[in-house]
Amino acid sequence: KIEDVPTAIGIQITNDGVRSSIVLGEMENISVWEKYIKAHNDKDLETIASIDAIDFKGYPPNGTVIDGSETHISFLKKWFADSNPQWTTRWMIANSATDKEGVEQQWLTTGQELTDSVEGEQITLNHIHDVLFVDGKIKMINVYERAKAIE
């Protein structure tokens, strides 16, 4: 009998040191993310809100916490009024891992270039987003950032 066992592509380590395998995740989350990024580029707050889970949490690189979809939409509304951020997706990896309660978590890890204007000057940053999906909605995003290399 041949068992259909997912191939591990990495390891997740919890805060208390518990290890679990990271395996290939649900590829459908890629199209959800593409719709989400397009909505950001189009300043379509209604679509963004429809993809956010009600209990959305965002962890931007500056150390703040965006708690709840309504707070996320308020944050974006102000940002979009003050600037014109644009994201270009460079790569996406669908992956999943089991949490300490034994629940399978669906993640999408993505690489984006963010072009924005700061004090009238255009900047480009590299972002990595770790995105947690629950029931087709985005429940949490961790954003990591570095300045784009000048070569």
Give the ranges of each region predicted by the language model:
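Short, low-complexity N-terminal intrinsically disordered segments enriched in polar/charged residues
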Residues: 1-46, 50
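Sec-exported extracytoplasmic/periplasmic mature domains
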Residues: 37-42, 50-57, 61, 77-85
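Acidic helix-start/capping segments at beta-turn-to-alpha-helix junctions
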Residues: 52, 63-68, 90-99
